[in-house]
Amino acid sequence: QLRYESIWETVRDCNIVIENLKGRNSEVAAGTLAAAFSIKGICYFNLLRSWCQPWDNDLADELPGIPVVDVFDITAKPLRGTLRQTYEYTDEQFRNALALNPSDKTYIFTEWIIKAYRARLAFWCCDWDRAEEICRDIIENSGYSLTPISGYEAMINSKYDASGEVLVRSHINNSSELDWYFSYMKGYLSSRPACASLIRLYGDNPEADVRYAACFDRKRMNVKTPECKVRLSEIVLMLSESLYHLGDEEGALRWLNELRRNRIEGAEDLAAATLPAVRKGDRIVVDALGNPVTPLLQAIFDERRKEMFMEGDRWFELKRNGRPEWWVISNGLKYTTRKYLYTAPISKDDIDLNPGLEQNPGYVY
């Protein structure tokens, strides 16, 4: 609830900046305006992922989206649009930012960072053609390249720097409050061993994969710095999966092997004919379109799970691909993850203030 309210406060601030800087021609105004459009787009992307049901091509014009708030007006009570309207509005924010040709790193949100978020948005909304186009643009023209094995651990566990293939990341200054928070979180996350199903993905020789030593100690405890990052590895993985959904399995496999060669010492390229059969008992059994997982898609999911560990990705992968249900026992009680729980509830304060606002399924106040 607090995060939901905090995001809307940021949208409000962005709208104030946008309203007051539109039409100004100075470089400072353009840079600030591009940053405001970018931040607003990211806010809507996060609202879309967390407070809307996962994308469904057949229901995108019916499922509730996020209210469009285009101006600062404390008296307005906008209702939720559709999922498709939210996608289009969010993409519009990124396009508005790109139209200002942002290049000054002072404002953080430069062309390639904005395009990376736009690719994430298209990928989440199963717009495979757009996701492929943007990912290729970033890979071919941004100047970023996959960090090789030799530089991976330094890149992935850098304390402050966005080094190597990292386009942008959290915790980029040495604020004492942030230092304390990240130290606390790293300690907390190191108190539980990683899931055995994740460890098994590394096979019989896990040390050959540079990600293993960069992420785990001998007791399977996490040692990876828990940061939010936008990296070229994610762009490559999105490109691979987009190509898969577009029917270009050869291209999907080619990009997957490109990533593996930069992560696994002596990696042998995967071949379509010899990919392992789909495992039984995995959480994800269907893809984003509801189709059964195939050996190639399983291979893409496996590399993504290893690559994006501790970067806030796994929950959204589960939500995007079928919202699997499962249960655990804790202190003698059974806790079940239901499908509806993948979508967070709209803030009760907003519902009370605006009774016409539709609550997400499964939640009753």
Predicted regions and their residues:
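Outer membrane beta-barrel transmembrane domains
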Residues: 183-185
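Short, cationic low-complexity segments
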Residues: 188-199
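Acidic/polar-rich alpha-helix caps and helix-coil junctions
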Residues: 2-180, 202-365
